[in-house]
Amino acid sequence: MSVLLWNCKNDKAGSDASTEDHMHDHSMVSGENVQPPLFNEIMAVHDEVMPRMKDIEDLKEQLRLKIDSIEVNMPDSKYKADFRFALAELNRSDDMMTDWMHHFKESYDTISSPAGKNDFLEFERAKIEQIKGKMETSIKIASQTLANTPMK
């Protein structure tokens, strides 16, 4: 419903073709009754984990500050490796999500057959669940690393 309302507000020419183009362009974002249920499931997982990207960026910044502090004040600290590992895990999950987002839309738009789209969506559902798990794990590792080190 919001896609249609959005299109009505933004369709200055009022043509049906223009509205259809807008609906196609924005159906990927809204996922409302235009895409198959499996697509909507995938987008629900995406929408669930996307806000965590901010958490990842915040944790990466905190870890970078700790690493910089260690290198200046305690170059032989045993914690440096822990911070670097946690940062690498966050970078991996960030890269996985970014790569998935770019690949998903590009690939989905090129598939024309319903069976091909379904196969693709089955594969992508597993992939986004894996990314979700990686993000949760990397956030947990980084949070625990920051919390369990005596450095302030």
Over which residues does each language-model region extend?
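C-terminal motif of bacterial Sec signal peptides marking the signal peptidase cleavage site
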Residues: L4-N7
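Immediate post-signal-peptide N-terminus of mature secreted/exported proteins
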Residues: D11-L65
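Short E/K-rich amphipathic alpha-helical oligomerization segments
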Residues: A17-H26, Q62-N73, D99-F120
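C-terminal amphipathic alpha-helix
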Residues: E32-M53, S113-K152
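Charged/polar positions within long, soluble alpha-helices
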Residues: K54-E61, L65-D68, D95-D109, G133-E136, ...
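Extended amphipathic alpha-helical interaction segments
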Residues: L63-L65, S69-K80, L87, T145
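Long, amphipathic, charge-rich alpha-helical segments that form helical bundles/coiled-coils
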Residues: Y79-I128
